[in-house]
């Protein structure tokens, strides 16, 4: 059996920088969460076609791992035969609709595992470019940096050298639909975009930035949109917590 861990991420900050061709561009600090991850295992057996277990509630063709498999079929022509003798089993720990990148992380880790088992015929850059066709966050998980500045549509991933923070996460029993949160932002908040307000943030270490700004609304442009889209979030006592991605997870630095 072959296994790989697919780690969650948080967004230390997330700022929308524009809107092009129907998609929002951004600047964000992604930080890997080392103690929260899904585990993907390739289990030997005999199967008629690609088989995926452990992702309940998501139809196969909509699953990010399956999309990654499809994206890899051309550069890995023997992959279809390989998955007639192996199935994919996912042990899920990352909650969905939580702003932690679980589906994207699964796709990125799966791609890294397949590339590694094939003696890495694709460069990490090439693998990340393939990943960008699956989802905006996938390239970050392909590179698997502990911390990185992510720009554009998510395809520009620049490692940021810093000591990773020890984080405490709080994920309420509230799912935030990423597409709806972005739609709310676009409709009501895009006009408030001000790149000067976050000038130089990408050069600051995450701990300093969280201490200096200390305001989840200022740090994450999607937070107000998430509050509007998921009003149950407003009923939570989240003083001292920051907001990751489109939600619904909050995080803070451990004492």
Swiss-Prot record:
Catalyzes the phosphorylation of the position 2 hydroxy group of 4-diphosphocytidyl-2C-methyl-D-erythritol. Pathway: Isoprenoid biosynthesis; isopentenyl diphosphate biosynthesis via DXP pathway; isopentenyl diphosphate from 1-deoxy-D-xylulose 5-phosphate: step 3/6. The gene is ispE. One of its GO terms (biological process) is isopentenyl diphosphate biosynthetic process, methylerythritol 4-phosphate pathway. Gene3D superfamilies: 3.30.230.10, GHMP kinase, C-terminal domain (3.30.70.890). It comes from the Bacteria. One of its GO terms (molecular function) is 4-(cytidine 5'-diphospho)-2-C-methyl-D-erythritol kinase activity. Keywords: ATP-binding, Isoprene biosynthesis, Kinase, Nucleotide-binding, Transferase. Coiled coil: none annotated. The keyword Acetylation does not apply. Its EC number is 2.7.1.148. It comes from Sulfurovum sp. (strain NBC37-1). Belongs to the GHMP kinase family. IspE subfamily. This is 4-diphosphocytidyl-2-C-methyl-D-erythritol kinase. SUPFAM superfamilies: GHMP Kinase, C-terminal domain, Ribosomal protein S5 domain 2-like. The keyword Nucleotide-binding applies.
